[in-house]
Regions:
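Small-residue-rich helix-loop
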Residues: 81-83
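Short, basic, alpha-helical segments at the C-terminal edge of helix-turn-helix-like DNA-binding modules
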Residues: 1-5
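Generic detector of contiguous secondary-structure segments
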Residues: 17-26, 69-74, 103-118
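C-terminal peripheral helix-coil segments that are non-catalytic and often amphipathic
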Residues: 93-174
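Hydrophobic alpha-helical connector segments
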Residues: 7-37, 41-54, 70, 77
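Hydrophobic alpha-helical bundle segments that form small-molecule/ligand-binding pockets
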Residues: 55-77, 88-108, 162-165
Length: 174
């Protein structure tokens, strides 16, 4: 099983932020070892048939420790699972089956030929973006991982959860 060690027990004294960050990192590492299952996880409801109750329990424990309560803990749980699966599924998307070498070369040529007058910011940042950013890449994260974006994404998810909790503490609806 690819995910047997993704969700270790959440000790009550542990910081929920660090535990969630570790969850995202372990999940990504597991999928990097088994990238062929990535497209199945987010795209087919049948992936739920391999339910991992320990994963659900530990995510809920971390969210409860953060301060989420019913019914909002369900929304937070869904957001965490979607975040955990989403980025990595996109990052590890497989190459097309039909002539992947020509497909990659054609896409690279199309990206590099974009006119600056139509796409000034894209062309200005093309050397930074080319094959290192979603939409303008021609290699999968299997070969060319998007680690910096993943780390920023995890930071954003955790900061978003913190923001929701702090709004609730300030009296706004969370």
């Amino acid at each position: 099983i690819a995910f047997h060690d993704v969700a270790p027990p959440f000790p009550p004294q542990e910081d929920w932020r660090g535990w969630l960050r570790g969850l995202f990192e372990r999940y990504r590492q597991s999928l990097q070892k088994h990238p062929n299952i990535a497209p199945l996880l987010g795209a087919q409801l049948v992936s739920n048939s391999g339910i991992n109750p320990l994963l659900v329990e530990q995510i809920l424990a971390a969210l409860k420790a953060a301060g989420f309560e019913a019914p909002r803990i369900v929304d937070a749980y869904n957001a965490v699972v979607a975040a955990m699966i989403g980025y990595v599924t996109l990052e590890l998307a497989p190459m097309p089956d039909d002539d992947p070498v020509d497909w990659a070369a054609e896409l690279e040529d199309r990206v590099r030929a974009l006119p600056a007058e139509d796409y000034p910011l894209l062309v200005e940042h093309l050397d930074l973006l080319s094959n290192k950013a979603f939409i303008v890449r021609w290699q999968s994260g299997r070969v060319n991982p998007l680690t910096g974006g993943f780390e920023l994404y995890v930071d954003m998810v955790i900061a978003g959860l913190e923001g929701i909790l702090s709004r609730r503490k300030d009296g706004a609806a969370a």
